[in-house]
């Protein structure tokens, strides 16, 4: 009865009376207006934004991410001939603490291309990478070995696990992130296949930040810089510098986490394969 009375007072429901049958409000307890009750009903506190944000942070499965953004050989305004496949020339990765927003470790190596050893003028202008820089770089195979050692040390130091590496925590608490699926799904996969390089299995699953960005913000950015600008961030460094792109991707991830976005693996090339933790740790 109390709920019905309150609903009437708030104008949510109406009672229709036959002519002459309407009671005197002064004598009808259900029709009498109790200001204290309405005030009390309107003052029931909703969950604060802070509490909702804390709850979503608690639901976030990853406390760390590894942001990767390869730079590769490229040519202007034309598809390269069949023998001109894109080769990685910059291999950057940054380990980002999503709780603090800080970059805690970096991996950065320039890679020597073998299939197209001479960089195009367009590639140099776009990436800022000079010919002498890649000439003194290392083969991709060597860089992957060095990266695996770096990854092992950083994960051990923080007790981190990647997705599918631990049966008791299949999600892990750290994941690779990229902007689109190109870096791992196309560039690295194709080059390793062509050159017979053993690609670590942990490169087979990652988070495409662009996919989650589009879903969360209901906005389709025209490029990465536009994505940053739309959420109030400015690109820091040089665009198409792999290490700068990776750092800005980490900053965007932290912003999205603060805004309440939840992240999960968006791409898994080997969905039924579990990682061998000994290969990483």
Curated annotation (Swiss-Prot):
Domain Exonuclease: 64-262
Keywords (A to Z) from UniProt: Cytoplasm, Exonuclease, Hydrolase, Magnesium, Metal-binding, Nuclease, Nucleus
Keyword set includes Magnesium: yes
Cellular component GO terms held in the UniProt record: cytoplasm; nucleolus
Keyword Nucleotidyltransferase: no
Cofactor entry: Mg(2+)
Coiled-coil residue spans: none
Region span, Disordered: 19-52
Acidic residues: bias regions: 27-39
Residues at the catalytic site: 71 (proton acceptor), 240 (proton acceptor)
GO molecular function terms noted in the UniProt entry: 3'-5'-RNA exonuclease activity; double-stranded DNA 3'-5' DNA exonuclease activity; metal ion binding; nucleic acid binding; single-stranded DNA 3'-5' DNA exonuclease activity
Protein's name in the database: 3'-5' exonuclease Snipper
Origin organism lineage: Eukaryota, Metazoa, Ecdysozoa, Arthropoda, Hexapoda
